[in-house]
Curated annotation (Swiss-Prot):
Annotated family: Belongs to the GAR1 family.
Protein name, per record: H/ACA ribonucleoprotein complex subunit 1
Gene that encodes it: Gar1
Gene deletion effect: RNAi-mediated knockdown in female germline cells results in a cyst differentiation defect that prevents progression from the 8-cell cyst stage and oocyte differentiation.
Function: Component of the box H/ACA small nucleolar ribonucleoprotein (H/ACA snoRNP) complex, which catalyzes pseudouridylation of rRNA. This involves the isomerization of uridine such that the ribose is subsequently attached to C5, instead of the normal N1. Pseudouridine ('psi') residues may serve to stabilize the conformation of rRNAs. Required for ribosome biogenesis. H/ACA snoRNP complex-dependent ribosome biogenesis is important in female germline cell differentiation during oogenesis.
Listed GO MF terms: box H/ACA snoRNA binding
Subunit note: Component of the box H/ACA small nucleolar ribonucleoprotein (H/ACA snoRNP) complex consisting of Nop60B, Gar1, NPH2 and Nop10, and associated with H/ACA-type snoRNAs.
Cellular component, GO annotation: box H/ACA snoRNP complex; nucleolus; nucleoplasm; sno(s)RNA-containing ribonucleoprotein complex
Amino acid sequence: MGFGKPRGGGGGGGRGFGGGGGGGGRGFGGGGGGRGGGGGRGGGGGFGRGGGGRGGGRGAFDTGPPERVIPLGNYVYSCQNDLVCKVDIQDVPYFNAPIFLENKEQVGKIDEIFGTVRDYSVSIKLSDNVYANSFKPNQKLFIDPGKLLPIARFLPKPPQPKGAKKAFTNNRGGGGGGGGFGGRGGGRGGGGRGGGGGRGGGGFRGGAGRNGGGGGGGGFNRGRGGGGGGGGGRGRW
């Protein structure tokens, strides 16, 4: 091998769920490229098990009935021993939120939420030894107010006023910003000594390593594949 020739950089990061990072090539004095970040899953919106979060807590123990309950809505009909309840309040219940009678006796949990944001119903999975034929039409069902989310969480955000400008900062040499949950990668990375950094990949930890890192991996949705790695570091003579 000849000492006068520095070795070239590494390959680009691949597209995919995890977003593999491209390693920078090793040369005499050139550091390997950093790992491309994996793209996260897209956040869920609206109803249908996307919005509102699942469950009332992770691995929570049964703490008994809540201090108070408020009306959620009225029982409308049953389907395979599940209840369908027309919701009468604006706030949105958690999935798996416990449902009670007025005397705080638990009868089941929220299973599905369906309809529009302003007009929706829920299905209730009944507890063991509780049967749908024991409920009367239009019977009130109740919920712990601590298991509700404000409706504003599910409404579109108001547009920004015209003329509002985003602040601009000029950081030389900064790596490309990681894309959002479904967005494209950030601008071109500045890179350190040696080759220039590749484009930043969509994901959390993409970015160039020292001495010409490879591009970050593609994000979960529509992220760009990582760019080719920069040239290796300076060769020794």
